[in-house]
Amino acid sequence: MAKIKFFALGGQDERGKNCYVLEIDNDVFIFNVGSLTPTTAVLGVKKIIPDFSWIQENQARVKGIFIGNAITENLGSLEFLFHTVGFFPIYTSSIGASIIKSKINENKLNIARDKLEIHELKPLETIEISNHSITPFKVSSSLPSSFGFALNTDNGYIVFIDDFIVLNDKNIAFENQLNQIIPKLSDNTLLLITGVGLVGRNSGFTTPKHKSLEQLNRIITPAKGRIFVACYDSNAYSVMTLAQIARMQNRPFIIYSQSFVHLFNTIVRQKLFNNTHLNTISIEEINNSTNSIVVLTSPPDKLYAKLFKIGMNEDERIRYRKSDTFIFMTPKVAGYEEIEAQILDDIARNEVSYYNLGREILSIQASDEDMKFLVSSLKPKYIIPTGGLYRDFINFTMVLKQAGAEQNQILILFNGEVLTIENKKLDSKKNELKLNPKCVDSAGLQEIGASIMFERDQMSESGVVIIIIYFDQKKSEFLNEITYSFLGVSLDVPEKDKLKTKMEELIKKQINDIKDFTTIKKRIGKEISKELKVSIKRAVMNLFTKMTSKAPLILSTIISI
């Protein structure tokens, strides 16, 4: 009988950097290697990625990486895993493979293409990896041809699904194969691992509230000028709907995102969208068009940055006209409300009509009834919700309990908590891995301790004060000269001069308080140096708080000359 372990390196009690590890006996399967972009401004932090230390220590056992829904939250840290640990085979859909290759071609993933081993899986075709049978199946999600995975073990199936909805539309791009895979898995599913989606936030099924054709037609049909539509690059469903409207209304169609242009071309090549009579033009022709539909699409952080530039007339291609119409199609995401409000203010200032459909149209994720259908059909012994906050997991549990699930069936895990199932029985003891997620800034990978993030917040909000003190080794004494640098500290000149005077008095007092800074070797000992720098930092911080109500980051250093 199989011994199974499951744990998350990211994605639990957070939205993003999804990364899950499944151990079946001695074999390891990784699901997703995503990244997270901070929704609040943290100075210099571009993204946060999982801690891959465990994978590095066990890389010989890793059989592959499985990516069913190829969005940033699921593949955004691929290059960092490959550079810090090594290359592993990737198993994904043809669309997923296209997205990964496109990002590599644009150098968004700093990976040599010839080192990649990407396996494009075919739906419902079982593959064998190290004596394990794995069956991919299509699920209806925001990207075409998204996959769920069913792994067969001696104890029953383990089913992994990121996002899905129950959908019976005859749309080959967003085909749902749950009805075909369920008979194979029903009554023999040991573990269901599934994204929490909209469960607990939206009762009923997600469909038809995810559809946008009617709302978009209502806005676009009477509009005389250009139509700008902003949406995340994970929302291919809406982009394809806009292309359909452009074709029906004989409007030129523009996608302002080179990576999404590649994805759209792949979708067309795979005959997932009929582009006959669709007039697609490049973004360079935007100013020659009077009635085009322009899709502005990127990951959330880059999309908002792009919209800011356009709103401030700093974009090299787009200038708003009074005849334009703007449509927001981004879902409500905690942390982005203020940014979104600022962008809409910029649009209004340009006298452009705008509409916000983000509250009307649901993202393509499971709602209450979708999840109830999946659970009641598969009848899993255990269920693990993923990809959400703790409160989402609690709501998920309440919804499924109302549908008849038992409390002990639903297992809530935090990052690093290791769940063990042996002979179909859950081990009541949870081991825990110590994880240290990394942040990516302009200098590359950095540690992400609480103190580091706090200091970055300080720098972004109040600036930095650098204090340099000089120590003469020959005379074994401090010089009177002290150098100050104020970076990003908003103070007028008289206030700054007054602060410098007070700071100098404080620092000289701190120096005088240290009586044993000289040694036989006529140098400052490490402990004395550290004590002095900490003392100066505290004193200057208190001074700033009292005199300015600001709290900049204080950096003090001692230079021996």
Swiss-Prot record:
Segments passing through the bilayer: 29-49, 80-100
InterPro entries documented for this protein: RibonucZ/Hydroxyglut_hydro (IPR036866), RNase_J (IPR004613), RNase_J_2 (IPR042173), RNase_J_b_CASP (IPR055132), RNase_J_C (IPR041636)
Membrane in keyword set: yes
Primary localisation category: membrane
Topology in membrane: Multi-pass membrane protein
Location within or outside the cell: Cell membrane
Any one GO molecular-function label of the UniProt entry: RNA binding
UniProt cross-references to Gene3D superfamilies, sorted A to Z: 3.10.20.580, Metallo-hydrolase/oxidoreductase (3.40.50.10710), Ribonuclease Z/Hydroxyacylglutathione hydrolase-like (3.60.15.10)
Coiled coil: none
Keyword Cell membrane: yes
Keywords: Cell membrane, Membrane, Transmembrane, Transmembrane helix
NCBIfam families: MG423
Record's protein name: Uncharacterized protein MG423
Organism whose genome encodes this protein: Mycoplasma genitalium (strain ATCC 33530 / DSM 19775 / NCTC 10195 / G37)
